[in-house]
């Protein structure tokens, strides 16, 4: 099967609704409690047994997830969606994060809306609607990759243990019998899906079809508008604060600085499990937090472009360069037949849990079918065609 490589999908343009918290911590509209009675709301399950394994949130509380059971032909198939929410890059920021659901399960919403990839309606999610669907809550601040602690600051950096403890709990609830499984994630959860992809695959026997998808998790090692590297500074803080040099892939850390191994472009070619990269070439989070954050945009000349997509010609030229750099960073990865790539042209960040981008529901001649079709074609190997 050839790689599904899309160079743009402009009809999926749409501004994602989000609010920026500390250091770009993001909560999308589809994680709210919502008001639409037709939206599937799924309750929170806490993994009490995780405490004995040291698999705890920043504040020491146990981790949690939301599970919607599959049925019919999907009863033995599983989707695991890792929640996003940026990172904490210093002791102070991690302590602040403890005061939210991104650092403590005691403060997590008790229900979340399941939309897009997590929808249980065939009309909204044709390939995966009847699968078992899980959303794993993010409360460690380092993309489920830490395994250390700071006793003096009363901080637990146990993301990797959380991932394994939740997976063990789900195995006991039937995932062990999975015939097909997909590990996915949004934003920093999309980065997690890359980092934990092979670990996830190793949980299953060879007879289980296991693949992974990163949605808006391809954070590029890019130069910002001032000529600096804003995201490098943030990632260096995350890696040093949580000691990720001990947990990031040694195939990467053995030859470049450990914090660079938090950038997907330096590790994706070593992922053995089939992996799908879904990202916007005009990623709204990266534009506002990596390319033109306030620290790099002292004059504020990028504000309208970053947050309202009202960009000048020169700014669009800069952003086109960013998109081309993203495509270039994926060239080698896309040559592996097991992998898939979909780079859209929408002004967005996280598209698999948005119904209007995941599966809009129209497929007439010349009209977009939605991301769901591309992901389904890749996962089930239904097509060999490339699209441009």
Curated annotation (Swiss-Prot):
Its EC number is 3.1.1.-. One of its GO terms (cellular component) is extracellular region. The keyword Cell wall biogenesis/degradation applies. It holds the Pfam family PAE. Glycans are attached at residues 30, 33, 304. Keywords: Cell wall, Cell wall biogenesis/degradation, Glycoprotein, Hydrolase, Secreted, Signal. It is an enzyme of class 3 (hydrolase). The active site is at 187 (charge relay system), 283 (charge relay system), 349 (charge relay system). Residues 1-24 form the signal peptide. GO terms for biological process: cell wall organization. The keyword Cell wall biogenesis/degradation applies. It is found in: Secreted, Cell wall. GO terms for molecular function: hydrolase activity. Its main location: secreted. PANTHER family: NOTUM-RELATED, PECTIN ACETYLESTERASE 1. Belongs to the pectinacetylesterase family. Hydrolyzes acetyl esters in homogalacturonan regions of pectin. In type I primary cell wall, galacturonic acid residues of pectin can be acetylated at the O-2 and O-3 positions. Decreasing the degree of acetylation of pectin gels in vitro alters their physical properties. This is Pectin acetylesterase 1. It comes from Arabidopsis thaliana (Mouse-ear cress).
């Amino acid at each position: 099967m050839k790689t599904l490589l899309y160079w743009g999908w402009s009809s999926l343009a749409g501004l994602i609704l989000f609010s920026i918290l500390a250091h770009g911590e993001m909560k999308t509209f589809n994680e709210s409690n919502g008001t639409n009675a037709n939206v599937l709301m799924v309750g929170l399950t806490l993994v009490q047994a995780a405490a004995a394994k040291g698999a705890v949130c920043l504040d020491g509380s146990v981790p949690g997830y939301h599970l919607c059971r599959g049925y019919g032909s999907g009863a033995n198939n599983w989707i695991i969606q890792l929640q996003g929410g940026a990172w904490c890059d210093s002791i102070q920021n991690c302590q602040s994060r403890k005061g939210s659901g991104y650092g403590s399960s005691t403060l997590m919403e008790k229900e979340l809306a399941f939309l897009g990839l997590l929808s249980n309606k065939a009309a909204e999610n044709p390939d995966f609607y009847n699968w078992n669907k899980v959303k794993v809550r993010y409360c460690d601040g380092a993309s489920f990759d830490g395994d250390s602690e700071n006793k003096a600051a009363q901080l637990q950096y146990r993301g990797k243990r959380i991932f394994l403890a939740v997976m063990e709990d789900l195995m006991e609830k039937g995932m062990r019998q999975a015939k097909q499984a997909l590990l996915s994630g949004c934003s920093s959860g999309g980065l997690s899906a890359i980092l934990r992809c092979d670990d996830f695959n190793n949980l299953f026997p060879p007879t289980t079809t296991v693949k992974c998808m990163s949605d808006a998790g391809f954070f590029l090692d890019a130069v910002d508008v001032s000529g600096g590297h804003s995201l490098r500074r943030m990632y260096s803080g995350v890696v040093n604060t949580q000691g990720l040099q001990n947990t990031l892939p040694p195939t990467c850390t053995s030859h470049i600085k450990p914090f660079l191994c938090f950038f997907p472009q330096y590790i994706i070619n070593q992922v053995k499990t089939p992996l799908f990269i879904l990202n916007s070439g005009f990623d709204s989070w990266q534009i506002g937090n990596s390319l033109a954050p306030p620290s790099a945009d002292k004059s504020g000349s990028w504000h309208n472009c970053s947050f309202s997509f009202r960009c000048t010609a020169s700014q669009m030229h800069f952003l086109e360069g960013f998109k081309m750099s993203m495509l270039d960073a994926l060239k080698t990865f896309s040559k592996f037949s097991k992998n898939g790539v979909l780079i859209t042209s929408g002004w967005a960040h996280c598209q698999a849990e948005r119904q209007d981008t995941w599966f809009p529901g129209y497929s007439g001649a010349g009209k977009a079918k939605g991301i769901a079709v591309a992901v389904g074609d890749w996962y089930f190997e239904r097509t060999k065609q490339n699209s441009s």
